[in-house]
Amino acid sequence: MNEQFIQFPQIDPIIFSIGPIALRWYGLMYLIGFGFAYWLGMRRAKNSNGVWTTEQVDQLIYTCFWGVILGGRIGDVFFYNFDRLLQDPMFLFRIWEGGMSFHGGLIGVIVAMIWVSFRQKRSFWNTADFIAPLIPFGLGMGRIGNFINDELWGRITDVPWAVLFPSGGYLPRHPSQLYEFFLEGVVLFFILNWFIKKPRPAGSVAGLFLIGYGVFRFLVEYVRDIDPNVNTVDDLITRGQLLSLPMIIGGLAIMIWAYSRKKA
């Protein structure tokens, strides 16, 4: 029966190792994402007529990098592994044993943007609107890393493109990582970079990012496998959906505020 479904490609998550040091596909995907964001940010700075300098973009992306890493790790522990943290507080610092939370990473990036905006004496919304279109590609690459790691797969299904994941019991499952790669990494990237082709009111680009990611993540959660220990709230809504709702509501509020202020 399983022959009709797609076999998971056996990819070693470690590209190569030298002694105790190993380069993993998951880490490489994040590096590619940040590298692309850096390149695109520099390109936009050079075309910004002096609104942004390459030095300012360098500072912004470097600071956001650490915001993603620290916020993503802390968010993963507090949102999804809090019970383990209570039993073993040092788990927070063993990064190699855990994952990354997007919502935690987002909080880390917001803190980083506030700090950079203060240092550069510019509006927070100006900073947020600049960084938002740079994010989706990195999100997509992170989902490719999840796929290679054989993790965060979807629920059992009989769709023709179902994948037999080894860690998923070789049962046919939705390749939800690839759905997220396409929606959050590709579609959202093109939406945002199309949106910024014309002048937009301050905050509207950031608001659109929050809406887009929140909606796409909320939808994919319906086919993403559920962790019965942490991922559902009263069996009605997953933890990921619960965390995405404030993004959607907040994004809509920011968009309404941005355009109403423009009219005023």
Swiss-Prot record:
Record: residues binding a 1,2-diacyl-sn-glycero-3-phospho-(1'-sn-glycerol): 143
Keyword Cell inner membrane included in the entry's annotation: yes
Gene Ontology biological process terms in this record: lipoprotein biosynthetic process
One MF annotation (Gene Ontology) recorded for this entry: phosphatidylglycerol-prolipoprotein diacylglyceryl transferase activity
Stored PROSITE patterns: LGT
Protein EC: 2.5.1.145
Class of enzymatic activity (EC top level): transferase
Location relative to the cell: Cell inner membrane
Main location: membrane
Described purpose of this protein according to its UniProt entry: Catalyzes the transfer of the diacylglyceryl group from phosphatidylglycerol to the sulfhydryl group of the N-terminal cysteine of a prolipoprotein, the first step in the formation of mature lipoproteins.
Entry protein name: Phosphatidylglycerol--prolipoprotein diacylglyceryl transferase
Native source species: Actinobacillus pleuropneumoniae serotype 3 (strain JL03)
Gene name per UniProt: lgt
